[in-house]
Amino acid sequence: MVSTSQGAYQTNPSENKKALSSLWEFVMRNDFTTKRKLDNSKQAKVKSDLSSVDLPKLTVVFDLDWTLIYASKQKLFPAQQRLASGKCFVAIRPHCITLLKIIRPLCNIMMFSAGTESYVKDVLTLIDPNGEYFDKILSRNSCTNVHGMWAKDLAKTGADLKRTVLIDDRRQSFLLQPNNGIPIRPWTGQEDDTELVKMEKLIMELIDEKNVCEILKLKYNMERIEV
């Protein structure tokens, strides 16, 4: 029983329950807070999608020898295949083809080797026989001699350098653009090697970064590494 003073509005408890129940149903049907959160979430997603559309594709540039393959003049283990030229035997690094297939729809893929043009083309008949993975091939004649060392000038790729990475086992390759470099352990034929699996994970982390140089500088600090 609700006590009332003079002039107060007297209510019935059962009517109060009905009124509160109706009010609660109204709130649940029209959850303005949730709608506002959903609207904000949708707007954020649209902005995110738009920013991703505006970004050029990430360009991934691979070195060849000791990064994707191992070559030797004599056959050292069963996985090696003789090149068509007959000059050497080549084995493809574990997970190489899988990596190329995974990132192909997401990235521009290029090859930048310090090997001769004829050698690189010969090796690519094993890695990419149908020409489906690599958008551009650069070889020794595109390298830059810096104090007697072959450096790779990524400006020659024609790609946006803020959205370009070079994966290479040789540190001197990064001399001209150190903050675009991703060092990888050289491969000499180990069957249990998983370096390219690690590269896949890193590439995926960089896919939507506006400036990969900032990330790679913090991660590797290649500017301070002596070659």
Identify the function of each model-found stretch.
Residues 1-62:
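Non-catalytic pre-domain segments flanking phosphatase-related domains
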Residues 51-56, 103-106, 158:
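Loop/turn segments within WD40 beta-propeller blades
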Residues 52-73, 169:
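Asp-based phosphoryl-transfer active-site loop
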Residues 58-60, 109, 164:
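Generic beta-sheet signal
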Residues 69-93:
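Metal-dependent phosphoesterase signature
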Residues 84-110, 144-155:
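Short, acidic loop-to-helix structural element flanking the phosphoryl-transfer center
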Residues 96-125, 138-140:
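Substrate-recognition element of Asp-dependent hydrolases with the DxDx(T/V) motif
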Residues 118-227:
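C-terminal cap/substrate-recognition subdomain and adjoining C-terminal extension
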